[in-house]
A protein has these predicted regions:
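C-terminal active-site subregion of NodB/CE4 polysaccharide deacetylases
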Residues: 1-6, 136-137, 141-170
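Anion (oxyanion) recognition and catalysis
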Residues: 24, 63, 140
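Metal-dependent polysaccharide deacetylase catalytic core of the NodB/CE4 family, i.e.
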Residues: 29-132, 152
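Generic detector of bulky aromatic hydrophobic side chains
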Residues: 13, 17, 111, 143, ...
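Terminal accessory/targeting
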Residues: 1-54, 60, 133, 164, ...
Length: 170
C-alpha cells in the first residue's frame, strides 16, 4: 500500500508507532542494533555520523520500553578479510586489513557511547549474519557483548543461525 511518504517518514510515523503498540500489547522488549552508516568503505577510514536525531529517537524509545541496544556494524560490511570469498551469495566487500576492521569497530563503539552514554551495549549481531574467522577474533574486544552462535560455512565465513545466545568470553 502506498502511504505517499518517504521511507524515513514511513518508519518514523507509521511503522514505528505500530511496533511500539505491538510491543506494549504483547509485553515485548526490542533489541536495537546500531549501524553508523551504509557506506561501502573498508579501508579503515571512518567518518563520524552527524545525523544523530534518528539514532537517538529510536534508541531512546527502545530503552524507554525496557529494550536493549547493541552493535551491528560500522557500515554493514561483515567483519571479513580478503581470504573470504562471498561468491555470488552476498554483495559485500572485504576489509583491507584487520586494523581497518578494528578502526571501524572502535568508531562504532565510540559513536554508540556518544549517543547513549549511560547504556551498556549488550549485543553484537554480525551484518547479514556473516562473521569470518578474523571477525570472530574481534568480537571479544566488544565489551560485554553476546553473539548468536554460528555454524561454519564454506569460504571461511560463519553464518549465525541459532536463536540461542552465547556469551562471548574476553
Amino acid at each position: 500500500r502506498d502511504y505517499g511518504t518517504s521511507i524515513a517518514d514511513f518508519y518514523t510515523n507509521i511503522w514505528w508507532p505500530d511496533m511500539i503498540a505491538l510491543a506494549t500489547a504483547h509485553n515485548v522488549q526490542y533489541t536495537g542494533v546500531i549501524i553508523e552508516n551504509y557506506e561501502d568503505e573498508t579501508d579503515g577510514e571512518t567518518e563520524r555520523q552527524d545525523d544523530v536525531q534518528r539514532f537517538q529517537y529510536f534508541g531512546n524509545m527502545i530503552l524507554h520500553q525496557g529494550g536493549e541496544l547493541g552493535y551491528h556494524g560500522y557500515n554493514h560490511q561483515p567483519l571479513s578479510l580478503s581470504d573470504t570469498d562471498y561468491g555470488d551469495a552476498l554483495p559485500y566487500k572485504t576489509w583491507t586489513s584487520f586494523s581497518a576492521m578494528e578502526k571501524a569497530m572502535k568508531e562504532l563503539m565510540d559513536f554508540g557511547k556518544e549517543m547513549f552514554p549511560e547504556t551498556t551495549m549488550s549485543v553484537y549481531v554480525p551484518p547479514s549474519n556473516v562473521l569470518s574467522e578474523a571477525g570472530r577474533k574481534m568480537v571479544p574486544c566488544i565489551p560485554r557483548s553476546v553473539l548468536l552462535p554460528a555454524i561454519i560455512f564454506p569460504a571461511t565465513m560463519l553464518m549465525c543461525r541459532s536463536l540461542k545466545w552465547l556469551k562471548m568470553e574476553s
